[in-house]
Every structure is written in C-alpha cells, then in structure tokens.
Amino acid sequence: MTKKRYTLLKKDGKARRGEFVTPHGTIQTPIFMNVGTLAAIKGAVSSMDLKEIGCQVELSNTYHLHLRPGDKIVKQMGGLHNFMNWDRPILTDSGGFQVFSLAGMRKIKEEGVYFNSHIDGRKIFMGPEESMQIQSNLGSTIAMAFDECIPNPSTREYVEKSVARTTRWLERCKKEMDRLNSLDDTVNKEQMLFGINQGGVYEDIRIEHAKTIREMDLDGYAIGGLAVGETHEEMYRVIDAVVPHLPEDKPIYLMGVGLPSNILEAVERGVDFFDCVLPARNGRHGHVFTKEGKINLMNAKFELDARPIDEGCQCPACKNYTRAYIRHLFKAKEMLAMRLCVLHNLYFYNKLMEDIRDAIDGGYFAEFKAKKLEEWNGRA
C-alpha cells in the first residue's frame, strides 16, 4: 500500500479542495504547477521569484534535462532541488510527450522508444526503466510514468494497442521506481509515481484504462493525451468520463491544459493538478492576463496607458510599472519586458488557484466560476 498523502478537505459539487503531503512540503489543491522546462522558467525568472509570486510546485522536463546538462550531472549536484535552489515540490514529466512529438525521428517498440536528439541528432533509447532512472537521478518529488501520448486523431484500433502497451509500461515503471527508491545512493528515496490515463477521445477505452490503473495503488493519477487537437467539448467529455473511475483519495492531474477557462471547467469536474507553458509563453510575447481577459501590450493603444497591467494585482510588475513602460521595453527589445510579463502571468495563475481554493472552501465555486467566465468573456 502506498502511504496516505492526499486528504480531501471539502467538496463543492464535484470540485475538490485538498492537501497533498510530500517530502518537500504540503501542496494545497487545486494547484497550477509553474513550468520550468530546463529547471528554470523561460523569461529570466528565478526560484526566488517563484516563491515571491506564490508558486507551490515547479515542473521540469525529463527529456530536456537528460540531454543537457545530463541527469547524472544533476545527481552529482545533489538533485534538482539542490541544483536550482528550490526547496518546494518538483514534478518531472516522463519525457514521453517530447519523444512522441518528434514524430518522424522516433520508432516505438515494446521495450521503449528509439529516437534522435533534437540537439545533435544522436541516437537515444528511452523506455520505462530509463525514464524512471533519469527521474530518480533528478530526485524530483513526483515522477510521471512513461507513456505514449497518442496523436489526435487516431484510429480506435491503434488507440487500443497503444493503451495496452502504456499499461504494460506503467507496470514496469512501478517496479523500477520501487527498486530505485530502495538503493542507498538514491537522491529521493520517497519519490512518488503518478500513472497516466490514455485513450484518445474514446470514452469507453479511457474508462477501462482508468479502472485498470487505479488497481495499481499509485500516488496519483493523470489524464494525459489531451490539448493535442481535440475540441474543448471533447476534452470535457473525456474528463467527465474518466474522473469517476479514479480513486477519490488520490490527486487527479490534467496534463498540459492551461487556459484559465479550461482550468475552471476542469476543477468543476474534480481535477486537482494543472500545468501548462501557456502563461510564460504568452508573457514572453507581451500577451498578459487581466480581470477582463487577455490583452496584447504590443497594441498601439497602450502607448500612453499609465495603468498597471491589471488594476489591484500585487505582482512585482503591477506594483511598480505601467503598461506604457512595459510596451516600450518590448519595442526596445529589452529582456526586462519578458521577465515582467512572465512574472505577472504566473502570479495571475497562482492567485486564480488561491481564489478557486477559497471558493470551494466557502461553498461558492459555481458562482465564482460563472462570474470569472463572464468577466473574461471568452478572452481567457
């Protein structure tokens, strides 16, 4: 039996307010994880900044860190927490999504995936055991199982075959994680493993897979293979189908889905964990989130705008600078422009999750969601 780590504190409809205890601190859920692909948020945002803007969990990428600086180097430096000076939880993805996004550069076999590095073209092999070994070297708080992220659309026949293989890979991940956690030189002997539900947009395949993996007694469960081309309606349909078949005493993680409106819809359906590169990527291009939805600071109408990005926001950008100044920085190609907008967007997301938790605690989540969607009016 896995150690009990998740406590459901309150439900408001299907929306869940919980706590997830980890070796690196307790996570208050629902939670948005801030994505630092190479152990840093793109846009010159440091681990100290992340604490200032209310980040609970940082997410790093196994595939990219394996290529550079190399997971063995990170292990020699004491693991990711020590390497990037971050003492709160870290989740590492399995590398699966990146490997499968290489399309023409990879071959899938039962033992794993053969692919070419996107950096120098060298041949690399990654399977369940290799993914677990890399993540163990990184020493993250939560490791993700190695799975195939199925492209959309895919035939039913292919999806069934892929999901069966992903299940076999999950069994191998669990066995290897148990072995690694027992070794004397392991960075984090309490590293946790989340399994990933797959099945494309086929609800019956998704449900059967959820029923199968919930029996494996993992630390948490993710819904993967979404935000890859399906409509929002299809995505919500899959969440509605899967969530009732996952354990209520474990966190549920919707991978890679990150529009604020998507988050509200998924929380309403019982999801606890979220991540997405979207707020940082948008920020680097001057697209920032506000109470009224997303705006583009590059627009000429902000040239003389003396307001902060978002009135009342307590992020470092809004407390100190105007829209006009930040727009000027972008036009002048100053790096500070990206930094300020990334900080703002991540603060916006972290504050949104805090407000969501308060709404569930207070029993007014439905009203909160309706008000937010009305304010954003399709712009977030």
UniProtKB/Swiss-Prot annotation:
Keyword Zinc attached? yes
**Which pathway does the UniProt entry assign to this protein?**
tRNA modification; tRNA-queuosine biosynthesis
Q: Which InterPro entries match?
A: ArchSynthase1/Queuine_TRR, TGT, TGT-like_sf, tRNA_ribo_trans-like
Q: Which UniProt keywords apply?
A: Glycosyltransferase, Metal-binding, Queuosine biosynthesis, Transferase, tRNA processing, Zinc
Q: Which Gene3D superfamilies match?
A: Queuine tRNA-ribosyltransferase-like
Reaction equations catalysed: 7-aminomethyl-7-carbaguanine + guanosine(34) in tRNA = 7-aminomethyl-7-carbaguanosine(34) in tRNA + guanine
Spans traversing the lipid bilayer: none
For this protein, the Enzyme Commission number is 2.4.2.29
Q: Which domain of life is it from?
A: Bacteria
Active-site annotation: 93, 275
Cofactor(s) required for function per UniProt: Zn(2+)
Q: Which residues bind substrate?
A: 93-97, 147, 198, 225
The keyword Metal-binding belongs to this UniProt entry's keyword annotation: yes
Q: Name one GO cellular component term.
A: cytosol
Pfam families named in the record: TGT
Molecular function as annotated in GO: metal ion binding; tRNA-guanosine(34) queuine transglycosylase activity
The enzyme class is: transferase
Please state which protein family the record places this protein in: Belongs to the queuine tRNA-ribosyltransferase family.
Give a short account of what the protein does: Catalyzes the base-exchange of a guanine (G) residue with the queuine precursor 7-aminomethyl-7-deazaguanine (PreQ1) at position 34 (anticodon wobble position) in tRNAs with GU(N) anticodons (tRNA-Asp, -Asn, -His and -Tyr). Catalysis occurs through a double-displacement mechanism. The nucleophile active site attacks the C1' of nucleotide 34 to detach the guanine base from the RNA, forming a covalent enzyme-RNA intermediate. The proton acceptor active site deprotonates the incoming PreQ1, allowing a nucleophilic attack on the C1' of the ribose to form the product.
Q: How does it assemble?
A: Homodimer. Within each dimer, one monomer is responsible for RNA recognition and catalysis, while the other monomer binds to the replacement base PreQ1.
PANTHER family attached here?
QUEUINE TRNA-RIBOSYLTRANSFERASE
The name of this protein is Queuine tRNA-ribosyltransferase
Q: Which organism is it from?
A: Clostridium perfringens (strain 13 / Type A)
Which gene holds the coding sequence for this protein?
tgt
